[in-house]
Amino acid sequence: MNKIKIKYYKNSCFYGEFLKSNDWFVFLDSCNDISGFGRYDILSSSPHTKITTFGNLINVRQGDNSSSFYDNPLDVIKKYFNFSSINSDLPFNNGMIGFFGYDAFEKKSQNNKFPDIAVGFYDWAIIVDHLKKESWLTFESKTDFISRIIKLCNNSDSNVNYNTEYTFTNFKNNTSYDKYIDDVTTI
């Protein structure tokens, strides 16, 4: 694992502005710039492997290759996850980031288009330590992509304008009120 110190910014949105349009961009924000209590922010994008599940239907995408099959989602994720330990003082170097939905382990009928599980396997990350006021770029191997990230992190203007305009769409419920009440009552 490689680790390079990069320029520290109190507001990690600076890095997010450059990365947000990348595939599967993730920003685990400690909200330190608002609360003063969070310590670490973690940013990454472009995972080398993406796994989404809908019940036992598994979709695996690695670069331009993809496959779909039925299996136990956790067994498949374990096959791709590298459990080797890395000696580092950082909370994350590379690995899996994603979500496990509430219905991921329930045998319910799929009633929406949102996956039960969506995880990416990332081989690089920007780690911002607000306590030490340091930022680090960690990565497996130096590629052209990583070289561009290093350049952006160290040679960027700190007066970047943050995009505060967002487009919202109408909220659409994926279940009826009666079905919702029935499900909550069951719990």
Cite the ranges covered by each PLM segment.
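Signature of the chorismate-utilizing enzyme
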Residues: 1-187
